[in-house]
Amino acid sequence: MNEYFLLPLASLPFPNINPILIQIGPLAVHWYGVGYIVGILFAWWYAKRLAANPKLWPDGILPMKLEDLDDFIVWAAIGVVLGGRTGYVLFYDLPRYIAHPLDIFAVWQGGMSFHGGLLGVILAMTLFSIKRGIRTWSLFDVVAAGVPVGLGLVRVANFINSELWGRPTDVPWAIEFPNGGPFTRHPSQLYEALLEGLVLFVVLRILTHSRLKLKTPRFVGGAFICGYGLSRIFVEFFREPDQQLGYLLGTNWLTMGMILSTPMVLAGIWAMATAKPVKQAQPQAT
């Protein structure tokens, strides 16, 4: 039976939450923007807590000054926005932006790529750590540990916006999205919020505090990119592919998200497999 003609015995109505959290005159604050801002601020706050805890680091020596993280948040925000937008343009809708190049700057119309944002942050992190004399992987570890919270919030905002919904299904928890056509769908945004957000954060928390893996540079960062990649690939089996791309290579299952996430899994496995504990830490903080 064609999945697009399934008639579920029961489904859940869409909660129909206003995508605008606060409206003050012409100024509108959207849940999506709040998710990004709160996510960045939480990652910054959490990274400072990790970097300030001597029990988590080799010989109890902190890997960086807390002021470095205060300065890095600006670099990170720029990397997320520029990388996320550039990634979406290149990976998901290049023909459109070649035909209409000015639309690249119309970020209010939507269109951000996590994979592009990750590359943007990694570039910013590399340049920043070189400038400040910080071990790049240690910076990546503390930043990555708090990122899942922001990922989860943004996916919830995607759900509120009724965007990036899942494939048609007749499972009991299927959702009738207002712009999802005449069939019910997987709430794949919530699947991602659970896996990329809550589950991944808990896993990284265990690694940083119970397994003390911050003493092994790049292990936590590797676990993050591997964990995200695996979560994203899994959810892509339930998520509707981007309309302008559809399924790739003549299949009825392969998506761009899977292709972009596979190298992340491999890179994460490599990072964890080759990570070695620091024998003697170099003082960076006072």
Swiss-Prot record:
Pathway: Protein modification; lipoprotein biosynthesis (diacylglyceryl transfer). Keywords: Cell inner membrane, Cell membrane, Membrane, Transferase, Transmembrane, Transmembrane helix. It is an enzyme of class 2 (transferase). Its main location: membrane. One of its GO terms (molecular function) is phosphatidylglycerol-prolipoprotein diacylglyceryl transferase activity. The keyword Lyase does not apply. One of its GO terms (biological process) is lipoprotein biosynthetic process. InterPro entries: Lgt. It is a multi-pass membrane protein. One of its GO terms (cellular component) is plasma membrane. A 1,2-diacyl-sn-glycero-3-phospho-(1'-sn-glycerol) binds at R155. Its EC number is 2.5.1.145. Catalyzes the transfer of the diacylglyceryl group from phosphatidylglycerol to the sulfhydryl group of the N-terminal cysteine of a prolipoprotein, the first step in the formation of mature lipoproteins. Belongs to the Lgt family. This is Phosphatidylglycerol--prolipoprotein diacylglyceryl transferase.
